[in-house]
Design a protein with these regions (language model features):
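Conserved NTPase motor "head" modules and their coupling/switch loops across ABC/AAA+ ATPases, GTPases
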Residues: 1-31, 171-309, 318-322, 326-329, ...
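Conserved P-loop NTP-binding catalytic core
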Residues: 11, 15-94, 152, 166-167, ...
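Post-Walker A helix-loop "phosphate-sensing" segment adjacent to the P-loop in P-loop NTPases
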Residues: 45-57, 295-303, 334
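Nucleotide-state sensing region of NTPase/ATPase domains
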Residues: 47-123, 127-129, 133, 138-141, ...
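Structural recognition of the conserved hydrophobic beta-strand(s) that form the central parallel beta-sheet
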Residues: 72, 336-343
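Structural motif
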Residues: 95-96, 271, 361
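An accessory alpha-helical subdomain
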Residues: 115, 121-214, 224
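Walker B catalytic acidic pair
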Residues: 313-315
């Protein structure tokens, strides 16, 4: 899989950009503030329909413009023309000029893995950061997961609204409230099972990568659902959720929010039974996240039968020589890699010699080699 070309209009600091990309390694370079990270962000938006840097789509539109457009051609046995149109109040998603209503179907067309400075938030950040990670990775594997988590969030909002109404003393349709809770449990079963299966798959790959980099055993990812589960069988999950809902309804009404379900899940990075969030050095944390991201490559290859596109946003300046080599040896020659950097000296000469070089200045290509 690779991104053949990219067209951007009115995105961040870009008026207009049309760029052809190499099937191998591409290096986007230039001074700070010229648009390198914005360029990678546009590729991320093209893949996921949303940004990893902003929750608000209108922030992606160039100031004083009404809309932004991102287009790209993905080659994966057959070509797909993907397009995102961002307006201030809505978003259009297209495949081959046809509008797409099910975003899950769109997301599976283009698989990417991004390495960037905020990756440490996967360990240091809030549980919501880790849930977001799980949701995005599983959505690349399964369109059904994306659709299910979206349905779950809509149902959750409705249930929380009902809890607020009960708290305010309003009469509600009790039968509908029960049906709503049943629907939430049904969606939860699928989400719990998919997340557990993904964590299990990570733990077949991630510890070996961590050991190869550090020489240390005992690394694992530990899934922490918001309910106590002896196993992930359908009936076990349903019964545990039902018990949690029944035993805590008064508390939920009091705080006007659903207390149990996948929206409160978390996972931890553990080394020799110690949580790296609390006890790991920053070096260990970086290697743990690096191992996680490298594991994603293998998992996507196994599930999709093709390699994802790798985005490296100025990460070489933060890695020592050994970590750079550890990263690069896990990236196959047949993968498309798009790297940003402020200084070509941060990248080994043998990589530069086989790469397409693109210099960006003030949102424009000013030099292109190969």
């Amino acid at each position: 899989m690779f991104l053949k070309n990219l067209q951007i209009k009115n995105f961040r600091n870009y008026d207009s950009l049309d760029i052809s990309l190499s099937k191998g390694t591409n290096i986007i370079y230039g001074n700070n503030g010229q648009g390198k990270t914005n360029l990678l962000e546009s590729i991320y938006v093209l893949a996921f329909t949303k940004s990893h840097r902003s929750f608000i789509d209108k922030n992606l539109i160039k100031s004083d413009k009404e809309s932004a457009i991102i287009k790209g051609t993905i080659l994966n046995n057959i070509p797909y023309n993907l397009e995102i149109i961002l307006n201030k109040n809505k978003k259009q998603v297209k495949i081959d000029n046809n509008s797409v209503s099910k975003i899950g179907t769109y997301i599976e067309k283009m698989n990417i893995i991004i390495f960037y400075s905020e990756d440490l938030n996967l360990i240091k950040g809030f549980p919501s950061e880790r849930r977001k990670y799980l949701n995005l990775e599983l959505s690349q594997i399964s369109p059904n997961y994306y659709n299910t988590i979206n349905d779950y969030n809509k149902l959750l909002k409705i249930r929380n609204d009902y809890l607020k109404r009960i708290n305010n003393g309003e009469d509600i349709n009790q039968s509908y409230f029960k049906i709503l809770t049943d629907y939430i449990m049904e969606k939860s079963v699928f989400i719990y099972q998919m997340r557990n299966k993904y964590i299990e798959r990570l733990n077949k790959v991630c510890p070996d990568i961590f050991k190869e980099i550090t020489g240390r055993d005992g690394f694992k990812i530990v899934y922490s659902p918001s309910i106590n589960l002896e196993n992930f069988e359908k009936e076990t999950i349903r019964n545990s959720l039902l018990e949690a809902f029944n035993n805590n309804l008064e508390k939920e009404i009091k705080i006007k929010s659903t207390l149990y379900g996948p929206h409160h899940d978390d996972f931890d990075f553990v080394l020799n039974e110690e949580n790296l969030r609390n006890y790991g050095s920053q070096g260990q944390q970086r290697i743990a996240v690096l191992s996680l991201k490298l594991s994603e490559i293998k998992i996507l290859q196994d599930y999709k039968g093709t390699s994802p596109i790798i985005l490296l946003d100025d990460v070489f300046s933060e890695l020592d020589h050994q970590k750079k080599n550890n990263l690069l040896k896990f990236i196959d020659n047949d993968m498309q890699v798009i790297i940003t950097t402020t200084d070509l000296d941060n990248i080994d000469k043998q990589i530069i010699d086989k790469s397409k070089l693109i210099k960006i200045d003030k949102g424009k290509i000013v030099e292109e080699v190969r």
